[in-house]
Structures are given as structure tokens and as C-alpha cells.
A protein has these predicted regions:
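ATP-grasp fold ATP-binding core
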Residues: 141-147
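Active-site loop/helix belt of alpha/beta enzymes
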Residues: 148-203
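A charged N-terminal "starter" segment
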Residues: 1-135, 139, 172-173, 177-182, ...
Length: 203
């Protein structure tokens, strides 16, 4: 038996392996199988658990058009970071009002592409990024990303992204000076954190 088929059998009970074997025979291995029904169920579970929270799917985690279309049909919003990701959303007809741009470093072209698409909300965490929005004024709305250092997190993104809390007043003052509205704060507690209380502590 070919090695890739042996690997498939180790991932599922023998009785359930037949469809995976056929997929590997047809498409080769390694192979990512996307179950849109499972995505739909998980999204609904999360929405039911957090009924008052807007849920934004980070496209970079799995930028497959079928995944995006499945979530869009469920009413999900989207976290975009590149013009290419905006093109994916444009291709499936996503409402631009359901998007937020979170890339920490943006070129003027990136900002313009997002605004042309209709994405109005951006995340910034330093004075240099803030200055890039002076040319766009009130066309854009900003969230200030604050550094939140959590103990025990596997991937601590606040080591390199986010301003110190003490810098927030300075950034607010400068945003007001250049006429760009700040509508809130943003933070990332990190990934692969087994304790849900970490999110509570961050809030």
C-alpha cells in the first residue's frame, strides 16, 4: 500500500478511511480537506456562546474562497491584512462594512486599496503608522492596538506589536491633531493559551 494511504488510515478509523483514500488517489498527498459544514457548525456555536460580540474571521488563517463564502453566508465579519485578501472578499460579494484592516505596517497603497473597497477601520500602534493616515483624515477610523503581555502564552504577539498603555494618551492627542477619529482599542492576548480567563483579564 502506498505510504500516503497508510498515513490516511492512521488518521481515521479503517471503516471511515475510504473517502480519504479516494481523495488522496485523486489529488495526491499532503492534502488539506475542508469541511464547510463543520466550519458552519463551529461558527454557530461560537456565535451562540458570544451573542453580543461581533465575530471577525482572520482571513490569513485559511484564505480559501469556500471557507470565506461559508462564513459570509452565516453573517461573519472579516479581519483583513492585505489587498489580496480584500480581492478574495470582493470576489464573493462581502459587504465592506463587515471588515477591519489589522496589518501592523501599511503602505499608503494598502490604505487606499482598503478605503476604495469600503473598509474604513484600521489598527495602529505607533506614531509613524498614525501619521500615514493624515492624508486620509476622517475617511478612516482607527483602533489603537495596546500591548498586553500574558504569562504562559505560547505565541506572545505583544512582544513586537502594540503600544504601551502609557502611550495611548499621546496617540489620541496626535490623532485628534491630524483629524483622524479613534473609535476604540485593540489587543491580542496571544495564541495557544489554554486558560480562557486570560481574555477576561485582558479586557
Amino acid at each position: 500500500m502506498p505510504e500516503q494511504l497508510t498515513n490516511v488510515i492512521t488518521l481515521a478509523r479503517h471503516a471511515d478511511a475510504a473517502p480519504f483514500r479516494r481523495l488522496v488517489e485523486e489529488h495526491g498527498s499532503p492534502l488539506l480537506v475542508l469541511d464547510c459544514d463543520a466550519m458552519r457548525r463551529k461558527y454557530r456555536e461560537l456565535r451562540a456562546a458570544l451573542p453580543t460580540v461581533g465575530l471577525f474571521y482572520a482571513i490569513k488563517s485559511l484564505p480559501h474562497p469556500d471557507a470565506l463564502a461559508t462564513l459570509a453566508a452565516e453573517g461573519a465579519s472579516f479581519d483583513v491584512a492585505t489587498s489580496g485578501e480584500l480581492d478574495l472578499l470582493r470576489g464573493i460579494g462581502v459587504d465592506a462594512a463587515a471588515t477591519i484592516h489589522t496589518h501592523p505596517i501599511k503602505r499608503e497603497r494598502d490604505i487606499r486599496d482598503a478605503l476604495d473597497f469600503g473598509c474604513k477601520i484600521f489598527v495602529v500602534d505607533n506614531i509613524d503608522e498614525l501619521a500615514k493616515f493624515e492624508a486620509f483624515g476622517a475617511q478612516a477610523r482607527l483602533l489603537l492596538r495596546v500591548s498586553f503581555r500574558g504569562k504562559g502564552v505560547v505565541s506572545d504577539l505583544s512582544r513586537k506589536f502594540g503600544c504601551e498603555p502609557g502611550a495611548v494618551p499621546w496617540l489620541l492627542t496626535d490623532a485628534a491633531r491630524i483629524g483622524v477619529p479613534v473609535i476604540g482599542l485593540s489587543f491580542h492576548v496571544g495564541s495557544q493559551w489554554p486558560d480562557p480567563a486570560a481574555h477576561v483579564a485582558a479586557v
